[in-house]
């Protein structure tokens, strides 16, 4: 019997592919990433690969929003907040950008696994 392998970046909340109940943990995690309204859409709830695709696109949209926030922060916020607040907002966006990069990798790995990919240990 082979041991389940997960690559770096695999979400700790999701059991390894092939482990008992792994898809249930994947669905729960993916739904937590998405807007709450997604839980009420039967097409997404019944088809885990579709849910994974929705989650990927949602995370990518969040990344785009963060990048836009970063690019516009100084010009858009300078008239409504002090320099210290603007700099704090930029730091927050940078932190969120880093977090979302990891989430994007994780959600992509889960999507690949739901599509049938199995990961192999490499030396």
Predicted regions: what is each one?
Residues 17-123:
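Eukaryotic low-complexity, intrinsically disordered regulatory segments enriched in serine, proline
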């Amino acid at each position: 019997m082979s041991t389940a392998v997960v690559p770096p970046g695999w979400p700790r909340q999701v059991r390894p592919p092939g482990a008992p109940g792994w898809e249930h943990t994947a669905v729960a995690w993916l739904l937590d990433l998405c807007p709450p309204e997604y839980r009420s859409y039967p097409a997404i709830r019944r088809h885990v690969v579709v849910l994974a695709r929705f989650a990927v696109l949602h995370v990518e949209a969040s990344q785009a929003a963060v990048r836009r926030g970063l690019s516009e922060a100084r010009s858009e916020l300078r008239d409504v907040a002090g320099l210290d607040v603007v700099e704090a907002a930029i730091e927050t966006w940078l932190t969120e950008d880093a977090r979302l990069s990891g989430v994007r990798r994780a959600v992509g790995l889960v999507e690949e696994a739901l599509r049938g990919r199995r990961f192999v240990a490499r030396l």
